Amino acid sequence: MIIKNAKVFTEDGSFMQGDVVVKDGRFDSVLERTADTDAAADSTQQEIIDASGLIMIPGLVDIHFHGCKGADMCDGTAEALDVITAYEASVGVTSVCPATMTIQRDELLSVMKNAGDYNYHGGAHLVGINMEGPFISPSKKGAQAAENIMQCDYDYFCELQDAAHGLIKLVDIAPEEPGAIEFIDKVRGSVVVSIAHTAADYDTAVEAIEHGASHATHLYNAMPPLHHRNPGVIGAVRDSEKCHAELICDGVHIHPSVIRATFAMFGAKRMILISDSMRATGLEDGEYTLGGQAVTVRGPLATLHDGTIAGSATNLMDCMRFTVRQAGIPLEEAIMCATANPAKEIGIYDEAGSISAGKRADFVLLNDDLDIVSVYIDGKEISC
């Protein structure tokens, strides 16, 4: 298959008018548009996709979301994962690393086993698990269930990782809690350690980073705000070039001005767009659940009964659009933050995150308004 005359988002983070050849479900070559490529395409018997006037981007990679279309990662069933992977694919998210919640020990073990045993049926590729809780701070629990929060337990984590067949890619830690630094020492190098749901001050966050933490979960949310005398986690993460930070750009969690300021402070290469979506995403307003707690959804806003924000009701493609349209971030940077950056962060960049020879042919064709025209996974068009 040849995708002809597309505005291709290339691995170097720029656009090129070109043709992309797909063979056996993988990108074979990316060619700048010339008369020679026209002749080569015309001489083959391959399927030709005319992408004139369209933008071709890699399939998006969401490394932090909980569910969609009525299903949640913590439902712990293959059917829920089928719903999640199908919906995410339909909105251009072709690789997913869904997040768990702070649920009961045995229940979390069952959720991990379900994901580890999951058989792919098409749709978005399940490429990892984001373990959001239970090793967090009760004072910054957000929408997590307080009764299930616990101190870091390395043996329990190993049990969960074994059940998931090594699929846990990120683990969230509140570094000020007892045993957290020792836990980081034990797991660093085998999983991405993310500072999350934390009341840590600057020095404690710096210590965690020095011991191996390299990621910040939904920056600004469930952590102390940036203060000019107490920079906290945000300041510590900003000061470490090895750290990457998630942003929920759904129009609820972070003001567009702060999105712009964060990109200016960190640089686009350190930003990762996430959706943090919950099961109401893709459905009507109403009453739902997240981590066993009741959630009310009205438009893009999802809240617990006390008003606490409880994830989002927005998919990653819409978050990327918001980043461009409302926050004014260049399209090239927004795409990178929703594709290459998250893929690199969880170690799947050899398979996903860019349109490059040898990688899975997961891509999205968009029009100039950033509306989805078509989605391809493993070189095959899927129903949107």
Model feature map: region roles:
Residues 86-97, 137-165, 207-219, 230-244, ...:
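Active-site gating loops and adjacent loop-to-helix segments of metal-dependent hydrolytic enzymes
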